[in-house]
Amino acid sequence: MEPGTNSFRVEFPDFSSTILQKLNQQRQQGQLCDVSIVVQGHIFRAHKAVLAASSPYFCDQVLLKNSRRIVLPDVMNPRVFENILLSSYTGRLVMPAPEIVSYLTAASFLQMWHVVDKCTEVLEGNPTVLCQKLNHGSDHQSPSSSSYNGLVESFELGSGGHTDFPKAQELRDGENEEESTKDELSSQLTEHEYLPSNSSTEHDRLSTEMASQDGEEGASDSAEFHYTRPMYSKPSIMAHKRWIHVKPERLEQACEGMDVHATYDEHQVTESINTVQTEHTVQPSGVEEDFHIGEKKVEAEFDEQADESNYDEQVDFYGSSMEEFSGERSDGNLIGHRQEAALAAGYSENIEMVTGIKEEASHLGFSATDKLYPCQCGKSFTHKSQRDRHMSMHLGLRPYGCGVCGKKFKMKHHLVGHMKIHTGIKPYECNICAKRFMWRDSFHRHVTSCTKSYEAAKAEQNTTEAN
């Protein structure tokens, strides 16, 4: 009995877990389920309350839209989603080591940040998981409808799911595994062979993990080693511009006694680039112009002043780094190969200058480790909201819809600019002729021409008065 009251307080410690277990049993039996999630044609029944409580994405879907049927993008792996859905009821998630990146991608889209954080911890503590993923490229393929059973596989984890998982468990338990991890990563960095096209993104992540493990050498060393990458790796649809000379002494320090067989010097960099240039064919000039346009859009980070015609253009940030995101972009990959080879040829002449600039930036205190929220494509962000917005770009989501015409946009400021069409607001006014404009680009063009006309008329008037 509580002091000073006539009431008794009792607690049921296991009650909440028991409730979730019963809800999970109901879900498996299809009882009292009030929402269906469709992933690549596979239908998963669930409870709105559980989904809304475990995922902000589902919370928006069931509360704001009152959806009874939610269709997820085809890039989502049905088996991965089923395991994540099961974890919402059980609080446990078994992730095969080669598929951790797939779980990270799915959880990022669903905004289940507790899963994202755990996946990030596993990747940071076990960088060899990425090395295993390089050898299991086929694991990213979504199961076909003829061979996939959406209701059976996740419940057979005791027999099939644990076959790969103990590997990651052993890596976490063994002290000596850290040395083998560094050796394995260093061997990836010192290879002369070209990596597969679907592993360029993972290789950037390998460099990141090496930088985090060697953080004892100082902030500048960590920042420097973070941006190192192999002499050449097949690019995604967007060309990478981070070509940096790898110092042999840096590799020796990072590997702690590892025998480095390859020595990278200026001659080998040029030789590797020349080999790349001979392997790729010349593309038409029109295709090159299209590539430059796409590259400019990515570098502009969807600038607020972009023209409305560009709002509906989708950019594949992942490129060929994952089979789910590759789609029908084989032509774009060829363009990326040729473009990156050209960029590398230009950078090889000034490679020492690039290294000097990088070292100077590291001494100024700029470190990529400050961005705590990474994306699978290799980009990192300082805030979760930025990563959410970035993930919507990957998946082609358009969450902002116009209530008048129904047109949808990726970014909120795109919708704000679109609403000017319906409201008729013209916020830009010319100071010379007082003409008003709805769009900023049109306003700037008019001001340029109007100013020239005004100055010409004024000069003509002055000449007439002088005569």
UniProtKB/Swiss-Prot annotation:
Biological processes annotated in GO: regulation of transcription by RNA polymerase II
Residue ranges of domain BTB in the record: 33-97
SMART domains reported for this sequence: BTB, ZnF_C2H2
Start and end residues of each stretch annotated as Disordered: 134-153, 162-225
Lineage: superkingdom: Eukaryota
Zinc finger (C2H2-type): 373-394, 400-422, 428-450
N-acetylmethionine: residues carrying this PTM: M1
A family per Pfam: BTB
InterPro entries registered for this protein in UniProt: BTB/POZ_dom, SKP1/BTB/POZ_sf, Znf_C2H2_sf, Znf_C2H2_type, ZnFinger_BTB_dom_contain
Covalent cross-link Glycyl lysine isopeptide (Lys-Gly) (interchain with G-Cter in SUMO2), where: K182, K241, K247, K297, K358, K458
Main location: nucleus
Record's subcellular location: Nucleus
Phosphothreonine modification, residue list: T423
Gene Ontology CC annotation, any one: nucleus
Biased composition (Basic and acidic residues): 164-174, 182-194
Keywords from the named record: Acetylation, DNA-binding, Isopeptide bond, Metal-binding, Nucleus, Phosphoprotein, Repeat, Transcription, Transcription regulation, Ubl conjugation, Zinc, Zinc-finger
GO molecular function, one term: DNA-binding transcription factor activity, RNA polymerase II-specific
PANTHER family: AGAP004733-PA, ZINC FINGER AND BTB DOMAIN-CONTAINING PROTEIN 43
Family named by the database record: Belongs to the krueppel C2H2-type zinc-finger protein family.
Quaternary structure annotation from Swiss-Prot or TrEMBL: Interacts with BDP1.
Chain's role: May be involved in transcriptional regulation.
Protein name per UniProt: Zinc finger and BTB domain-containing protein 43
Organism: Homo sapiens (Human)
